[in-house]
Amino acid sequence: MATLHAPAFELPEILNTKTNLADARIGAQVIECSDDFFAEAKRMLQFEAPIFVEDKFDDHGKWMDGWETRRKRHAGYDWCIVKLGVSGKISALDIDTTFFTGNYPASASLEACYAPNGDLTGVTWQSILENTELGPSQHHIFMVNNDAIFTHIRLNIFPDGGVARLRVYGDVHIQVTDHEQTLDLLALENGGRVIAYSDAHFGHPRNLINPGRGVNMGDGWETKRRRAPGYDWCILALGKSGKIEKIEIDTAHFKGNFPAEVSIQAVYLENATDAQLIPQSMFWSYLLEAQPMQMDHIHEYVNEILKHEKISHIRINMIPDGGISRVRLWGKIAKS
């Protein structure tokens, strides 16, 4: 059986530093749906790009990599409620119908609500996307102008059909405020985010702050082979400023392509724009001087951490190039 892979798709640059709040890897899950006879709704939340396997059928018909409902024979429409992996502000939507050609929905709308306790009884759903026409086998990017914090979304498809992937791009809302608790201040679920990077040819630096260890080499930050002097770097913002007690640099799955060394610079800045940070970052003080890397290994540093006060941003320098899977900054949230 031949397997077709989704065509390459370049996300609009404005969304490169946003988080997919509906990513199953960070805990997004389907709560309820009207129907998923042909293909389970949870497939729509997978990180991997959709595939099409020719001649693959199951007991319900043609196997499809996404959410697909049966043909509607009465009035109405289909819907799916998703709990976001982390609450946050929604900046954009990607309703992807890749490989759904004669079975894509005619149109779709999306609503969102805030229900931190998970109880959706009596919640107020806000319209994020009005009913909008969809096309076959393509990405549909919709920008959202709404500053509210949301925990759940409801995708409505009219009247029925299939969606390969649903991605909800936005900024994580930080809920942790305990100043005595030690936590990963850089973690995605705690509000960490990517600001800028020198290169992301093989893997995006947003993977550095994902939960758990990397599942493969593609689940990390990897740059192209450097053919000129210098090194690669990325700038990240902590979810909350704090003082760092322990650093972890994980090169899981990187064996012939791990960097020779990694160093970390840091700074505390209030109200700085992302554009301001990039040229200033090369002058930030070192939090961790260049450390030699090993392949496929978790490197832990405590005594090597240099004296510092609270920090809000870091710059990771990967010398000269290569790939790392995860970076963890364990510490406590700074008191105001």
UniProtKB/Swiss-Prot annotation:
Keywords, sorted A to Z: Hydrolase, Purine metabolism
Reactions performed catalytically: allantoate + H2O = (S)-ureidoglycolate + urea
SUPFAM superfamilies: Galactose-binding domain-like
Any Pfam family the entry gives: Allantoicase
EC number(s) given by UniProt: 3.5.3.4
Enzyme class (EC, first level): hydrolase
BP terms from Gene Ontology: allantoin catabolic process; purine nucleobase metabolic process
Molecular function as annotated in GO: allantoicase activity
Superkingdom classification of source: Bacteria
Pathway info: Nitrogen metabolism; (S)-allantoin degradation; (S)-ureidoglycolate from allantoate (aminidohydrolase route): step 1/1
Ranges that cross the membrane: none
Family, per entry: Belongs to the allantoicase family.
Stated name of the protein: Probable allantoicase
Organism: Acinetobacter baumannii (strain AYE)
Gene name, Swiss-Prot/TrEMBL: alc
